[in-house]
Amino acid sequence: MNIIEANVATPDARVAITIARFNNFINDSLLEGAIDALKRIGQVKDENITVVWVPGAYELPLAAGALAKTGKYDAVIALGTVIRGGTAHFEYVAGGASNGLAHVAQDSEIPVAFGVLTTESIEQAIERAGTKAGNKGAEAALTALEMINVLKAIKA
């Protein structure tokens, strides 16, 4: 039996992070967590990290797709926060972002890590951006790095 697993240390990785400005008071913490994980755990060099800001979570798939198509990056990390309100807007934005990012990953065949919080409240979002529930930005970064190495191992 063959088993493929990979670690997260990827010093030569070229990683793009696309991040939503909307809810930036939460997203800034996700970005800090992602960059810290890339550098400290993944050993990614600062010059190999590109950050692209977009207006909101709905725009993340378009930016991620454009970044993936350049061929310059080994992975894309998408960061944002969608908080449920009193209308159906939450479902459209959260669904559009998650489905769009999944399509980008499948079409480009590079890892697109989903670091978009979809929460019921601001409190839940804050918990997932570096307090009680860890930092989902850091988790997305580690996922991206591991998947870079998993795909390399599959293709080897």
Swiss-Prot record:
<dbReference type="GO" id="GO:0009231">
    <property type="term" value="P:riboflavin biosynthetic process"/>
</dbReference>
<comment type="function">
    <text>Catalyzes the formation of 6,7-dimethyl-8-ribityllumazine by condensation of 5-amino-6-(D-ribitylamino)uracil with 3,4-dihydroxy-2-butanone 4-phosphate. This is the penultimate step in the biosynthesis of riboflavin.</text>
</comment>
<feature type="binding site">
    <location>
        <position position="114"/>
    </location>
    <ligand>
        <name>5-amino-6-(D-ribitylamino)uracil</name>
    </ligand>
</feature>
<dbReference type="GO" id="GO:0009349">
    <property type="term" value="C:riboflavin synthase complex"/>
</dbReference>
<dbReference type="GO" id="GO:0005737">
    <property type="term" value="C:cytoplasm"/>
</dbReference>
<feature type="binding site">
    <location>
        <begin position="57"/>
        <end position="59"/>
    </location>
    <ligand>
        <name>5-amino-6-(D-ribitylamino)uracil</name>
    </ligand>
</feature>
<feature type="binding site">
    <location>
        <position position="128"/>
    </location>
    <ligand>
        <name>(2S)-2-hydroxy-3-oxobutyl phosphate</name>
    </ligand>
</feature>
<dbReference type="InterPro" id="IPR034964">
    <property type="entry name" value="LS"/>
</dbReference>
<comment type="similarity">
    <text>Belongs to the DMRL synthase family.</text>
</comment>
<feature type="active site" description="Proton donor">
    <location>
        <position position="89"/>
    </location>
</feature>
<dbReference type="Pfam" id="PF00885">
    <property type="entry name" value="DMRL_synthase"/>
</dbReference>
<dbReference type="GO" id="GO:0005829">
    <property type="term" value="C:cytosol"/>
</dbReference>
<feature type="binding site">
    <location>
        <begin position="81"/>
        <end position="83"/>
    </location>
    <ligand>
        <name>5-amino-6-(D-ribitylamino)uracil</name>
    </ligand>
</feature>
<dbReference type="InterPro" id="IPR036467">
    <property type="entry name" value="LS/RS_sf"/>
</dbReference>
<comment type="subunit">
    <text>Forms a hollow icosahedral capsid composed of 60 subunits, probably arranged as a dodecamer of pentamers. Unlike in B.subtilis, does not interact with riboflavin synthase, and the core of the icosahedral capsid is empty.</text>
</comment>
<keyword id="KW-0808">Transferase</keyword>
<protein>
    <recommendedName>
        <fullName>6,7-dimethyl-8-ribityllumazine synthase</fullName>
        <ecNumber>2.5.1.78</ecNumber>
    </recommendedName>
</protein>
<comment type="pathway">
    <text>Cofactor biosynthesis; riboflavin biosynthesis; riboflavin from 2-hydroxy-3-oxobutyl phosphate and 5-amino-6-(D-ribitylamino)uracil: step 1/2.</text>
</comment>
<keyword id="KW-0686">Riboflavin biosynthesis</keyword>
<feature type="binding site">
    <location>
        <begin position="86"/>
        <end position="87"/>
    </location>
    <ligand>
        <name>(2S)-2-hydroxy-3-oxobutyl phosphate</name>
    </ligand>
</feature>
<dbReference type="InterPro" id="IPR002180">
    <property type="entry name" value="LS/RS"/>
</dbReference>
<dbReference type="GO" id="GO:0000906">
    <property type="term" value="F:6,7-dimethyl-8-ribityllumazine synthase activity"/>
</dbReference>
<feature type="binding site">
    <location>
        <position position="22"/>
    </location>
    <ligand>
        <name>5-amino-6-(D-ribitylamino)uracil</name>
    </ligand>
</feature>
